[in-house]
Amino acid sequence: MEKSPEHCAEGSPSPATESAPSATEPPLPSTEPPLPSTEPPLPSTEPPLPPLPPDFEKYWKSVQAYPEDFNTWTYLLQYVEQENHLFAARKAFDAFLAHYPYCYGYWKKYADLEKKNNNILEADEVYRRGIQAITLSVDLWMHYLNFLKETLDPADPETSLTLRGTFEHAVVSAGLDFRSDKLWEMYINWETEQGNLSGVTSIYSRLLGIPTQFYSLHFQRFKEHIQGHLPREFLTSEKFIELRKELASMTLHGGTNDDIPSGLEEIKDPAKRTTEVENMRHRIIEVHQEIFNLNEHEVSKIWNFEEEIKRPYFHVKPLEKAQLNNWKEYLEFELENGSNERIVILFERCVIACACYEEFWIKYAKYMENHSVEGVRHVYNRACHVHLAKKPMVHLLWAAFEEQQGNLEEARRILKNIETAIEGLAMVRLRRVNLERRHGNVKEAEHLLEEAMNKTKTSSESSFYAIKLARHLFKVQANVVKARKVLSNAIQKDKENTKLYLNLLEMEYNCDIKQNEENILAAFDKAIKSPMSIAMRVKFSQRKVEFLEDFGSDVNKLLDTYNEHQKLLKHQDIVKRKAENGLEQPEAKRLHAEEVSTAASVPVTTASMDATQSGYNYGSWYQYNYPANWNFGQYYNTPST
């Protein structure tokens, strides 16, 4: 169960022990151009803003600089509470709760500050915002109900209607939570205080069919409620008449012909009246016993899952692996066995406790795709705008969903937002490129790739985007000249990047070989004369010999290339012998180091993106299977030296 109002800040240090440099908050830019004024402006009637507490700015600057550091927020909030400065408190709490809306205890703190300053309407608004942000918080609903009890006028006839409506809203919103027992009990106790015993019966009838932690206790108290009052008191008139008719029909079926009133009339015979009361009580308990038995069976199915949930509330600290696994297994169980209502409630509970984990939000959105388009958007919106603002995969999936729905502008906006939040994210830039390509905007796709290529900070990143751009120009726009230029320029900047040469060759091979022989040979020569390792240049040389053997038009070129290849092989042997004698680093070891360096420099993003990179493994596009060294001596005589 949600612990205490401070549960989001366990172990938070006092602001007195921390400090941060001071600064002022920059003004927000205007989004509308000012209209021309034809009259002199009227003097402002709004009172000037009160000065902020002396140390407010240093704490404010700290949270602006590190919005994801929970402790910096707690320093700020503790400070404004100590100062009891309402304007500063509003600014701090509004900003904090925009980042951490699931910290239900801070909604109460905020409302208490408003109430302390006699701002009852403002406090009510804070509570309403809170329960809208975390609808399943049983504790927050109960705090709000207690607030209403304290602040509403008991003499006003509307008060009881307001409270009853709020209780109903609370149990509809949070009453299916397994740990919602105390909210139901609060509702029952309040209706009992109002003397509305039929209302109490109605609440119990609903509660006994809901799997909750103290389901058995509720049934026991329900039986006490039935045994402690007369049916006329705890049943509505309609229910009383309906039950009386049911019992009368059962009596007539049994052969008894006693006169039993069909309406609300009292039975005059005391003995018969007592018998009817007992029969009614017995029948009501009997009906609810069946409901209880079914509910007990449902509770038994989920009891072990519920017992394993140790932290049902939100916290910034990571959950233990066992807790995460329990949520996964519980969700799978409900997806196979539960109703839509129960599944949605469990997902909502899960994304409170596991708010910082992408996989649960994604699973929730995927489930909602079969039920409600707006429901999917609501899930993605909460995940991407509040809890997972810098997690790319959930943004990518949201953008893909909107693209499926035909909302291209929304998909563009989502991708642009995450790219702004995390600069240099290759997977997002490529998703933006391919979104435009899929919908025929090939020039915009080209522009996005060029922009990414020119903004990179390293030559390897620039080469990565150059390869992408060249493939786009060649395969999508059929512009081989422009694609060749892109790769050639990239080679000039990153002369040891094997992938550039391989992609240039691949492109030239895919053109008409007869008409493109000179360009293919030029591409081979670029690689062979490059500063790449001798082993890699030998491989390109082997490929050149093979090309001329299979497709070449001039035997003289073939013989010349073969001779050059033999010289390169001899040079490779010399390098190898030097390495064996300890004069140079072994070629194989150096090659391995270069491969590791190249792999490490591929532009991805942050350390947290490891799990998402497997889907963007471009290495397979650049692989070639080179044969072993060919013995061309069987065809050509080795030239004399």
Curated annotation (Swiss-Prot):
It comes from Xenopus laevis (African clawed frog). Belongs to the PRP39 family. It holds the Pfam family HAT_PRP39_N. GO terms for cellular component: commitment complex; U1 snRNP; U2-type prespliceosome. One of its GO terms (molecular function) is pre-mRNA 5'-splice site binding. Residues 10-23 have a biased composition (Low complexity). It is found in: Nucleus. Residues 24-50 have a biased composition (Pro residues). The gene is prpf39. This is Pre-mRNA-processing factor 39. Involved in pre-mRNA splicing. HAT repeats lie at residues 50-82, 84-116, 118-150, 158-193, 304-336, 338-370, 372-407. Its main location: nucleus. Keywords: mRNA processing, mRNA splicing, Nucleus, Repeat. Residues 1-50 are annotated as: Disordered. It comes from the Eukaryota. InterPro entries: HAT, TPR-like_helical_dom_sf. GO terms for biological process: mRNA 5'-splice site recognition.
